[in-house]
Design a protein with these regions (language model features):
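A contiguous, surface-oriented mixed alpha/beta subdomain in the mid-to-C-terminal portion of proteins
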Residues: 72, 76-141
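The feature captures two recurrent sequence modes
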Residues: 1-94
Length: 141
């Protein structure tokens, strides 16, 4: 369903990542499957988290090249929008770009900057991430 939605909307790096991940169409991928691809391409891993996590934990994970993944799945009534991230959002929405070396390094650097930031600055960094990475800010030639 979502593959049709992203046609003509997603950048090539994201589409390349979708292909590299080889996400199954008939089941939820296992985190070990995602880790094998991410580690081979950029040295990243996914880290199981309960759902929303504190900013400190978020930046710690990114700084250690681990992307937080909540392992619950949304209900059929929540297919179009869910307020907190589920495994589909994390794997389909974020992991494809983490196969791209440039984006993976950007995310790693963002995590390190977040750890150096004050508590107040972390709020702004988290908002910037939310409004760009979460909602998808992209410009290509």
């Amino acid at each position: 369903r979502q593959l049709k939605v992203i046609e003509g909307r997603a950048c090539q790096e994201y589409l390349d990542g979708i292909e590299q991940l080889g996400l199954p169409h008939d089941r939820i991928p296992q985190l070990d499957e995602i880790n094998r691809v991410l580690q081979a391409t950029t040295g990243w891993r996914v880290a199981r988290v309960p759902a929303l996590i504190p900013f400190q934990t978020f930046f710690e994970l990114l700084a250690s090249q681990q992307f937080p993944v909540a392992t619950f799945i949304r209900t059929p009534e929540e297919l179009d929008y869910l307020q907190e991230p589920d495994i589909f959002h994390e794997i389909f929405g974020h992991c494809p770009l983490l196969t791209n070396p440039w984006f993976a390094e950007f995310t790693h650097t963002y995590g390190k900057l977040g750890l150096k930031a004050s508590k107040e600055e972390r709020v702004f960094l988290a908002r910037l991430y939310w409004m760009t990475i979460e909602f998808g800010l992209v410009e290509t030639d």
